[in-house]
Amino acid sequence: MFELKNVTRRFGKKLAVDSVTLAIAQGQMVGIIGRSGAGKSTLLRMINRLQEPSSGSVHFAGVEVSGLRGQALRNWQRDCAMIFQQFNLVPRLDVLTNVMLGRLNHRSTLMSLLNIFTREERVHAIAALERLGIEQTALQAAGTLSGGQQQRVAIARALMQNPKMVLADEPIASLDPLNAKIVMDALRDINEREGITVITNLHTLDTARNYCERIVGMAGGRVVFDGKPSELTAEAVKEIYGTDKDGAGIDETMTSTSLESKRRAEDVSSGRVAKAAAVH
C-alpha cells in the first residue's frame, strides 16, 4: 500500500500542493489530471523525493518514505522509477548505455563511476528494448532518436530498475497521437504484466479514461475528484478544469491523443476560425 498523508508543498507564499491524502493499493494504474499549475508534477516529485514536502508524510509498505536518508533514500528512488516529459536521457551516449544506467542504484560506487556493466545487465537491457520495440536503436546515440523513441528508451531504463512503482510525469505531452498510444500501451503492459503500480500525470481526459482504472483530479493544489473513469461526470470535469472565458465547459476532444478525436478537434477549430472570419 502506498499512502500520502496530508502532504503539502509551499514555494514561498505559493501553495503548490494542499493537504493531499491518498491511499493507492499495489498494482493500480492511476491517472492524475488537472490544468497546468494544479500541483500534479510537484506531487509526483515529492513521492520520488526529488522535492521535500513542507508538511505531511509519504508512506510505502509501512515505511515512511519522506523520512528516508542516505542509502535508504537511494533504495527508494531505485524502487520508485520516474519517467519525465523531457526523457532525461544522455544524448551523446548510445541507447543501450542509457538503458543500463537504470541499474546504477543496484551497483557498487566504483562500477557505477567506471560505467562497467555486466553481460547479464546488457542482456537485460536489450530485452527491455525488445519489449518496447526499439531494439534496432541500441547502438544509436540517444539524441538522434525521435521523441516517441526517446520516451520508450526512458521506459526501458525504468524497467532496468526493477521498480515496485513507476511515476510518469506527463509522459505523452510532447508526443504525436500515434507515439502517445505506444507509450501508454507500454505503461499499461508494465502495470498488467508485472503488477507494478503506475501513477501518471496526464493532460488528456480520454487517455486517463482509456488507460487508468482510477482517476485523481487536482485543482489549485487540492484533490477535487478521486474515483473510477465512469464516475468522471461533466460536473466533475468542470470542477477540475473550470470553464473557458465564455463560461463553456471543456471540450475533451480538444485535448485528446486519439487520431480521430484530433481530427474532430481540428474540424471544430477550423469551423471557429471560419466563423470568426465571416463575422469580420
UniProtKB/Swiss-Prot annotation:
> Which family does the UniProt entry place this protein in?
Belongs to the ABC transporter superfamily. Phosphonates importer (TC 3.A.1.9.1) family.
By which gene is this protein encoded?
Answer: phnC
Question: What cystine pairs are annotated?
Answer: none
How is the protein disposed in the membrane?
Peripheral membrane protein
Top-level taxon:
Bacteria
Annotated EC: 7.3.2.2
The molecule here is called: Phosphonates import ATP-binding protein PhnC
Chief location of this protein? membrane
Signal sequence segment = none
- PANTHER family reported for this sequence: AMINO ACID IMPORT ATP-BINDING PROTEIN, PHOSPHONATES IMPORT ATP-BINDING PROTEIN PHNC
Its subcellular locations are: Cell inner membrane
**NCBIfam families with a match to the protein in the record:** ABC_phnC
